[in-house]
């Protein structure tokens, strides 16, 4: 049981480190953090950033390699992300008309990043 707790703690810390790394990358590129780990009724969004008028919803995936990280984002999770984003946008002045996109940030076991901008639509 202790090994499971230890692995869970390791995974949690690795996920936090991945989010921190991705956030630094976005900030370096001029984005401003709006919310981190935003949670609505429909689910959680890892990072919400803004560049000008555009809102960027970022899902961070960390694994041994980029392929495994990418494969861990399934259709059900994408549907939850869409629903959570719609919930967040409902509070924006322009609502669903707010310019936005979904990015997926892949982080491999060595900490390298690969950002897939506009990874999937929002319809």
UniProtKB/Swiss-Prot annotation:
It comes from the Bacteria. Pfam families: UPF0102 (PF02021). GO terms for molecular function: nucleic acid binding. Belongs to the UPF0102 family. This is UPF0102 protein SPO0400.
